């Protein structure tokens, strides 16, 4: 056992560099000269150096020293003892330096702050200089020397190097040497991690309550919360900005659609009373035109859904939802027209909000219900006898209501014409009863709104009656046929408005067709010249 320890100690000393050995030797001789030992048991080295120097080695050194003295003519035993003490203290200095991973003579650029280095050197000097003078302390130190071995000092060196170089707390590395070393050794020789207990605990608390940024700076918990709040606020701001941009884009598209509808209305030459529609149009009428343009866009989308549902052979439940949406869509149109009738009924009766081809088939500001039923019956085949009977009864009742409304409107027109033509027309506004005539005419015009409301209610009820009579798929084909019919009328109006307008009068080169038309026109004038 003594020979193994001696061989390990000699291997450790052989591994030391020359300058380190000299440095430790000088320190050891200075300490020995300052306090010469009085007996053999008084010069026990520190506990840290006891791992590499034992009683067996001292005895062997004394024996060899005594033999050499007798053989060589006398060597002073005190010199041998002082040399052994110097070697033991140099081993203690080496162990203290090995704990830090770098010897003191080479610590030019330390890898940790200077205050940690000073604490480490002060701790090592205290451990080296604190040697007991009584026998009990010598025995305790001797027992600690026997417990420590080079194999147990290696984990200490690894733990010390990891803690000081990384400057962080590693629970896994610190637990290994603490478990391996006995309690007595831990009491006299605290682990290197405990030397940095003040600073290491602070760093551990900072890491517990904060985090480290990418640039290596430590951020406390309060700053981290503020940074998180700033990131969340920036994310919400980006979402609001995105929604605002989408709203602006939607408004821009809507404005383009309104401008397109107004341009289309002007190109169709809508005139009321010999003036432009834009000049005499009220605010309610302009708002209705914009809402009707939006309604047409939605109607096109719903027609596409109906067509897709019929082609995909959807179930009656899914197809019925689309049909109900179409019915609600028409209800919305009737509500818009009723709101405008209370403010500007003439705008609805003249049909200036519709295309020219649609106005040709208008009856009191809209479609004639009986005529619409005649168009829809061939599109709804096959129909059962009960369905056909219900549609015929609906058509007959619609015709009777239309006739009654037409007669009432005709009587209103006749009464209004008689009221306006009352009195003398040659005097103009200077007539004595002019204001009375205008007041009576205004009262009769107020009843014109009632006629229009009754006609619109008839159209609305006809659509709801058709929905009750027909099945789900028949109702889908019904709404699809109505939408396609008026879509073709609008397309016809656009084609008529975009047709080429040729001037047949005053042209130098006339086509044969134009020449024939002019010749026919002259013949007709000569034929009816006598009339």
Curated annotation (Swiss-Prot):
Cite the GO molecular-function annotations of the record. DNA-binding transcription factor activity; sequence-specific DNA binding
The highest taxon in the source lineage is: Eukaryota
Q: Where in the cell is it found?
A: Nucleus
Q: Where is the composition biased (Polar residues)?
A: 116-154
Q: Which residues form the bZIP domain?
A: 220-264
What ranges does the record give for the region Basic motif, renumbered to this chain?
Answer: 222-242
User: Where is it found, in Gene Ontology cellular component terms?
Assistant: nucleus
**What is the name of this protein?**
Transcription factor LG2
